[in-house]
Structure formats: C-alpha cells, structure tokens
C-alpha cells in the first residue's frame, strides 16, 4: 500500500509518500517561520493561507521525488487534529478531495499519535511496548504504548508545555522567533550553575508536569539581571527543563518496567535533552529511540506512516469529514475497533 500523508496542523506544511514495501519514499516540508517571525508567534489566518499556497506544489514535489504518479497512490492520510482549525481544514480538504477523485480511501489521523509512531520510520525502530515522551510546543505527555491505538497516558502538563516554556522564556530574554532553538544556541555560551531554577513537581510522586512556575521564576530573574547574564539564564533554564523531563522519564520506566524509551516531538531535537536522556537510559539499561531530526518537528512522513498503520487494518473515514482543535489521545482506539 502506498499512502500520501498531508500535515497542516499549525505552521508547517508537510507532504510525504510511504510505501509498505519500500518504506518512506519521499517527504517535503515548508516551514512558515519567516511568515510569523515579525509577529512573534503563529497567526492562524496567515498559517491557513500559506498552507493553501504550499500544499499542491509540495504534493507535486514528493510525487516527483518518489518517481510515481497520482494514480499510484492507494490511500491518503491527513492530520485531523488537534491543531488550528483553519490550518487543519486546508490539509483535510485537499486530502479528501484528492482521495475522492482517485477513488481511494482517506483517513484523518491524530497528530500526537503520528508523533508517537514517528520513530517507527527509523532503521532500528522500537518494538512494542514502550514508554514515550511526547514533548513539543503544544504538548508534554508521558505515554505507555502497547501498540497502535493502545495508549495509556501516564502523565501530562498541568499548564504550559515544555516547548511553550522554551518559547516564552526566549521571548523574555529578547530572542527572536522561534524561540526554542535560539535559546538553545544562547545556552551553549552560558553557565547553567550560576542560577538554580526549580525542577517542577520532581519533589513529589507522580508523572505530571508543570512549567508555569519555572517561567515565572525566570521572569523574576530576568528583571533583576543584566544583558550580560542572558546566556547564563538560558543555560540554567534549559538545564532545569531537561532535568525535569529526564527525572520523569526515569520514573516512568521504573513504574512500567519498560526497557524501551521513545522521545518524540519538536523539543526532542534539543541537544542537551538527547545527551541527558542517553545517559539516563544507559544507566537504566533501556534502549532509547528518536526520530531523525527532520522528523522531530511536524511532518507529512509521520502522518503517512500512521495512516498506513490504520488503513492497512481496514480503517477509513466516510465521505463526511471534520477536523478538531482538541482531541485527547486517550480517545483513540486500536484499528478495527469502533470509536
């Protein structure tokens, strides 16, 4: 089965073709960073308009790279949610129209499920079951994954997501959008030991997260510091977030008895996080799995693969379609089971 994947949940337009026999044949991504930079964040209307401009050219591009034609596509998968409704509608409308025109099945997939399954596209994918940390600008979740659609949320953020905390802290430090990567760069020249920020909710049992208090502490520190202190503040903040994520993942491995840990989502590209998670996993005797850097952020490849996982079991949508801004991961069911 050859599946075209369409991702348009926020500010990146992603297209990809996944083949069950050949694997990932092609993927292409357009980031809207330049479009939103002057506003300091994503403007939903601008995001939707840019998806409209990009989705067809990117489709042509992946078809050319894969060396196939539209009639070679057996199914189309698209991101149904969660995300920005207008942006989701662009991808969903294109995908459903194309599927209808080709006479092939279509399926709307869950954005977070696609992130969870992204490491399956790597040469050494994790076997089920595993524990996954999904850490991005919009989500921070610890999930026990028994199989496709078989998820148990172990912990989640009670307020800001880790990526959101990175972006907001970067803004406090006067860094340009997108803030997360810029903060990581600044932190490289800083001393993380100069400031001691809290490791939120690590002093009590449980696997939930909270980053709003840490953000407030950083704000207070910035207000009392000089411009020359910014790198040290960035390094101390990054260290606090990474320590928190590592501690919670260690707890999750112990609580579940799992020997496999998956890190996915945009924050999973952070170098310090990868380094510290590797050290912790080695100490715990667990294998550590990431998607390649290009597949940490939103992309069409993970959508195409997730669509294939479900479509190959006979699941598909009817002609009516909807998108959803909010869609709890716990609402998903395994392929073949009623929703």
From Swiss-Prot:
> How many cofactor units bind, and how?
Binds 1 Fe(2+) ion per subunit.
GO annotation terms (biological process): tRNA threonylcarbamoyladenosine modification
| Keyword Acetylation in record | no
Report the InterPro entries cross-referenced here.
ATPase_NBD, Gcp-like_dom, KAE1/TsaD, Peptidase_M22_CS, TsaD
Task: Indicate whether Isomerase appears among the record's keywords.
Answer: no
**Taking the first listed entry, what is the main subcellular location of this protein, grouped into a coarse class?**
cytoplasm
Catalysed reactions, as listed in the record: L-threonylcarbamoyladenylate + adenosine(37) in tRNA = N(6)-L-threonylcarbamoyladenosine(37) in tRNA + AMP + H(+)
What are its cofactors?
A: Fe(2+)
Single annotated GO MF: N(6)-L-threonylcarbamoyladenine synthase activity
EC top class named in words: transferase
Which amino acid positions bind substrate, per UniProt? Answer: 134-138, 167, 180, 270
Q: Where does Fe cation bind?
A: 111, 115, 298
Q: Which residues form a coiled coil?
A: none
Quote the function comment for this protein.
Required for the formation of a threonylcarbamoyl group on adenosine at position 37 (t(6)A37) in tRNAs that read codons beginning with adenine. Is involved in the transfer of the threonylcarbamoyl moiety of threonylcarbamoyl-AMP (TC-AMP) to the N6 group of A37, together with TsaE and TsaB. TsaD likely plays a direct catalytic role in this reaction.
- Which PANTHER family has this protein been placed in? TRNA N6-ADENOSINE THREONYLCARBAMOYLTRANSFERASE, TRNA N6-ADENOSINE THREONYLCARBAMOYLTRANSFERASE, MITOCHONDRIAL
Q: Which family does the entry's similarity section mention?
A: Belongs to the KAE1 / TsaD family.
- This chain belongs to the protein called tRNA N6-adenosine threonylcarbamoyltransferase
């Amino acid at each position: 089965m050859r599946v075209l994947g369409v991702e348009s949940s926020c500010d990146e337009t992603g297209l990809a073709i996944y083949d069950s026999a050949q694997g990932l044949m092609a993927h292409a991504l357009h980031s809207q960073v330049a479009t939103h930079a002057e506003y300091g964040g994503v403007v939903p209307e601008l995001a939707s308009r840019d998806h409209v401009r990009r989705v067809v050219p990117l489709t042509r591009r992946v078809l050319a790279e894969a060396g196939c034609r539209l009639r070679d596509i057996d199914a189309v998968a698209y991101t149904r949610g969660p995300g920005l409704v207008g942006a989701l509608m662009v991808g969903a409308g294109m995908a459903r129209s194309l599927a209808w025109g080709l006479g092939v099945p279509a399926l709307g997939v869950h954005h977070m499920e696609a992130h969870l399954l992204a490491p399956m596209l790597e040469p050494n994918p994790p076997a089920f079951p595993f524990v996954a940390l999904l850490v991005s600008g919009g989500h921070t979740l610890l999930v026990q994954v028994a199989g496709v659609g078989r998820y148990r949320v172990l912990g989640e953020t009670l307020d800001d997501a880790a990526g959101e905390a990175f972006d907001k802290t970067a803004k406090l430090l006067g860094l340009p959008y997108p803030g997360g990567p810029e903060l990581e760069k600044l932190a490289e020249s800083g001393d993380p030991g100069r400031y001691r920020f809290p490791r939120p909710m690590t002093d009590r049992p449980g696997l939930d997260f909270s980053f709003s208090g840490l953000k407030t502490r950083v704000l207070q520190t910035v207000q009392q510091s000089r411009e020359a202190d910014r790198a040290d503040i960035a390094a101390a903040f990054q260290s606090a977030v990474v320590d928190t994520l590592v501690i919670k993942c260690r707890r999750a491995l112990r609580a579940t008895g799992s020997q496999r840990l998956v890190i996915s989502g945009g924050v999973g590209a952070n170098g310090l996080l990868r380094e510290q998670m590797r050290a912790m996993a080695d100490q715990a005797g667990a294998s550590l799995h990431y998607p390649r850097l290009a597949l940490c952020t939103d992309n069409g490849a993970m959508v195409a693969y997730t669509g294939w996982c479900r479509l190959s079991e006979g699941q598909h949508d009817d002609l009516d379609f909807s998108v959803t801004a909010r869609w709890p991961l716990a609402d998903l069911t395994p392929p073949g089971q009623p929703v």
